[in-house]
Design a protein with these regions (language model features):
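C-terminal non-catalytic regions of proteins with extracellular/luminal or membrane-system context
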Residues: 1-29, 101-105, 109-111, 210, ...
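Extended catalytic-interface subdomain
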Residues: 328-332
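Binuclear metal-dependent hydrolase catalytic cores centered on His/Asp/Glu-rich metal-binding motifs
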Residues: 282-304
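Short acidic, glycine/proline-rich loop/turn micro-motifs
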Residues: 232-236, 284-285, 333-336, 554-559, ...
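A Trp-anchored, charged/polar loop motif used as the substrate-binding/catalytic surface
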Residues: 301-310, 525-530
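N-terminal beta-rich core of secreted/periplasmic extracellular enzymes
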Residues: 3-276, 281, 306-323, 347-414, ...
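Histidine-centered catalytic/metal-binding microenvironments
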Residues: 461-475
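Conserved, charged catalytic cores of large soluble enzymes
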Residues: 333, 443, 450-465
Length: 677
């Protein structure tokens, strides 16, 4: 029995009846008029899960083990979007993967219609990629839950999402950051890291928890525990910087903020990613693509020293699930695996993707590091990024992954492959499954759902969802954190704070939508009373917000080098220098990667670093109305040659004295550097 065996939880039943037993109320989820063990909230989640698994059909078990993207009825990503429509009722098929663009062998179900997915394919886990207002999100969540409650066993839906609480003036990226602006907006992950404040992360995680659960989202694909040891990787901006102790502290605290000291009915479940560390990229290329599929470790002991500690911190905090990355580790690596986990006496690795490697998932993650929750694959490991197991059929890939510990498959909407794997195994095929192979994973998944309290009450109040999303205190914390995160790199001539009466020229340099963001910054300055001009010739001072970027799905190309030179990533360096030579210029560098600054820094009057910030909050810093406190969360490299020579598995702060950039005043732009105004 649970600790609160007699404490009546709130029961909300909309499609099924209730039962009264011993003066207590329970949901009659299977509709038989009797209290089944899985309906009895006095039992532990593990006991309830074991009972429910025993009642589930093979098809229901297979459906539970997929988590696919799902859209609202008016979503532009739905097959037939209809303005104002709440539920998407149309199946949608695709001939290529939506994230990697890899062609499928045959058309794949990209997303189910709501009722077809829940009632026919028995799916319960969904990825939310739309970005509606919180009350609309809550209404949609409730509608899905009511369909699920009306199913044979009444198993509720679990909605998950990538992060939603970071300010963004850049276009959204499918599969990475799709949503912003509807909840309290904090700086990007690197901006949080710039404050070196683990206690803040506990508060931040709690804000996410309150706002998401109020809107009917139950789990986050986050946060990233990856160490960004290769500066050219396009996902550096999703990390907490390069200091392994701070990253570990941050991952622990944000997980505790989201989940609490232990997972419970008010928790936001965390899926920490990408085990055992996705930052070890070959020349920056990502394993979403076949040319970036390998993890090659040049430094002995780097896995244990740098890449595993943040995941251990997540596990120590009770992270509900872990997501392995697509990569496959290679035997040209230095020695990084414990000898007892080597593939053979002479080979560390089987050279298959982490999700398919029993030594990584079951033996290292579960056995040695103590993971007690479930393993959630990354998107597309079966049909798009099956690195190292391409020779297997898709059902055989499902079978192999299940046997190596994967419990749920991301961005899958069709359980047919799992059912085919069981059919193959039960017909005697050695590379298939039997139904019993699905049951441990189903039990782990159901344990989370029971622990989250969704069997008793999965419904939320839309009005409350909107109120919590717009909570003034939470929004103020986010805005204050944005302002504090800014890093002062140089201001030795006193260019800052800006003078309101100085005629100011403003420019934003970025690859896409630069005029739009320039307009946002000009509007914010104008509202603050700053005198603006349209040309350099009229100006007495200038602000250039330099926003270079490496986009995962457009810049990572086969045979094309990835660069961290701003000139290669949307910045007109000649124009920047022209402005700097004409008038005293404050250069604001938005740091999503460790940029090479030798062409743009020397002629600037002042240099700041941002890590995603709204225009209004940046203006507050420029005018001296807010105090920037940030320190560099990444070491800025001296040159492209320094980047190429550095080991891809060691952070910049440990790459030696010849690695960091030194500015015109002699400041060394290494991890933790930053001045004050």
């Amino acid at each position: 029995m649970t600790d609160n065996a007699s404490s009546q939880p709130r029961i909300d039943a909309r499609a099924k009846g209730t039962l009264t037993v011993d003066g207590l109320t329970f949901k009659d989820l299977d509709g038989d008029g009797q209290l089944a063990p899985y309906e009895d909230w006095r039992l532990s989640p593990q006991e309830r899960a074991a009972d429910l698994v025993s009642r589930m059909s093979l098809e229901e078990k297979a459906g539970l083990m997929i988590i696919g993207s799902h859209y609202m009825g008016d979503s532009p990503l739905a097959k037939n979007p209809t303005p104002g429509k709440l539920l998407n009722e149309d199946d949608s098929w695709a001939d290529k993967h939506p994230i990697s663009g890899a062609p499928f062998e045959k058309p794949v179900l990209a997303t189910s219609g709501a009722r077809q997915g829940i009632l026919e394919r028995h799916q319960r886990f969904y990825i939310v990629r739309d970005n509606p207002e919180a009350d609309r999100l809550a209404e949609w969540s409730n509608a899905l839950q009511e369909i699920a409650e009306g199913s044979r066993l009444g198993i509720p839906v679990v909605l998950t999402s990538n992060p939603r609480n970071h300010v963004s003036v850049a276009p959204p990226t499918f599969g990475v950051t799709e949503a912003a602006g509807k909840f309290a907006d904090f700086p990007g992950e690197l901006g949080l890291a710039a404050l070196q404040d683990p206690a803040l992360m506990r508060k931040f995680g709690d804000v996410c928890r309150q706002q998401w659960r109020a809107a009917g989202i139950h789990k986050m694909y986050g946060y990233m525990a990856d160490m960004p040891t290769e500066p050219r990787w396009s996902r550096v901006n999703g990390t907490f910087g390069e200091d392994v102790q701070l990253v570990s502290d941050y991952v622990r605290e944000v997980t505790l903020g989201m989940q609490g000291e232990k997972l419970g009915p008010d928790s936001l479940a965390a899926t920490v990613k990408h085990f055992p560390g996705g930052g070890v990229r070959l020349d920056g290329h990502d394993p979403h693509f076949h040319w970036g599929q390998t993890n090659e470790y040049p430094t002995s002991g780097s896995l244990e020293k740098y890449h595993l500690p943040p995941f251990q911190a997540a596990l120590d905090a009770g992270a509900s699930s872990i997501m392995p990355y697509y990569s496959r580790p290679m035997n040209n690596s230095a020695e990084v695996m414990p000898k007892n986990l080597w593939f053979t006496d002479s080979e560390q690795f089987e050279e298959v993707a982490f999700a398919y490697d029993d030594r990584i998932t079951n033996q290292l993650l579960r056995g040695q590091m103590g993971h007690a929750g479930y393993i959630n694959s990354d998107s597309g490991i079966i049909d798009a990024m099956p690195w190292g197991v391409e020779h297997l059929t898709e059902p055989q890939r499902f079978a192999r992954a299940v046997k190596t510990g994967v419990d749920i498959f991301s961005d899958m909407s069709d359980p047919a492959g799992i059912l085919e794997a069981v059919a193959e195994g039960e017909a005697g095929g050695e590379l298939g499954l039997v139904e019993a192979d699905l049951e441990p994973g189903c039990a782990r998944l159901l344990t989370e759902i029971f622990t989250l309290g969704l069997f008793e009450n999965p419904y939320v109040d839309p009005a409350n969802a909107l109120a919590v999303a717009n909570d003034a205190e939470m929004k103020a914390l986010g805005a204050d954190t944005q302002r504090r995160s800014v890093t002062v790199l140089r201001n030795e001539v006193g260019a800052l704070p800006l003078k309101r009466d100085a005629k100011l020229y403003v420019d934003v340099q970025q690859r896409k939508d630069s005029l739009f963001v320039t307009g946002l910054l000009r509007d914010a300055l104008r509202e603050a009373g700053v005198t603006l001009v349209d040309t350099i010739e009229e100006a007495e001072a200038a602000v250039i917000w330099m926003r270079p970027s490496i986009f995962l799905f457009t810049d990572d190309k086969e045979g094309v080098p990835i660069s961290v030179n701003p000139a290669d990533n949307g910045v007109d360096v000649d124009h920047v220098v022209e402005v700097q030579n004409a008038v005293p210029t404050t250069l604001v560098v938005n740091v999503t990667n460790p940029w090479i600054l030798h062409e743009v820094e020397p002629d600037a009057a002042a240099v700041l670093a941002t890590y995603e910030i709204s225009a209004a909050n940046l203006v507050a810093v420029l005018l001296g109305e807010a105090t920037p406190e940030g320190k560099l969360p990444l070491t800025m490299p001296r040159s492209a040659e320094a980047v190429a020579a550095a080991p891809r598995d060691v952070p910049g702060l440990d790459c030696g004295d010849d690695y960091p950039y030194i500015d015109r005043a002699g400041n060394v732009y290494t991890y933790g550097y930053g001045q004050t105004l």
